[in-house]
Amino acid sequence: MRLAAVALVGLVLVAAGCGGGGDSSTTAGGCEDVDAPAPREDGGRSAPNEELDATKTWTLTFDTSCGTFVVTLDLDSAPKTAASLVSLARAGYYDDTIFHRIVPGFVIQGGDPTQSGNGGPGYTTVDPPPAGAAYTKGVVAMAKTATDAAGTAGSQFFVITGDGSGIAPEYAVAGTVTSGLDVVERIGELGDPTTEEPLQPVVIHSVTVGSDT
């Protein structure tokens, strides 16, 4: 079953199906012209048992073919989701993956090594979103299947790039882009509004975990 993504009119995840890119030159939009990495298997992981230190500020730095952006995790709203994202990032789960779904003016979505829209780490966590959760530009939340309970999360995430006011509060709020929102917006321009597929591969080279002391 494919993950049911947030939507304006019931949009669902689609397979990326990105073709070849180029020789790592830079395109007019400021993104590297790169080849999409080969899809790889997912699953087989267990949910982390370790809780994050809530006295610290935890961040994820995404190094992508369109630049770098930083997400500050929301441990108050989604502590289990945050711990899972940190664990997956430290394990290199997100390295050399793509944004397989890009809807201009709405969301960019990634976190699936299989590039099919079906992938996940082999487990889920649940952090019910707070009542009245607002999915505004720059908010990072977790995709789930249509039948999953509110706040269910695997590895796939989406970043709001436009008006998310119509999104029901059903998706775990992982955090907010606190640096590099222009990079997120740049990525958000590289999708086909009809198919929701990327017009060129946008690769996540690596995700680095940070925390203050």
Regions found by a protein language model. Give the residues of each.
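Cyclophilin-like peptidyl-prolyl cis-trans isomerases
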Residues: 2-213
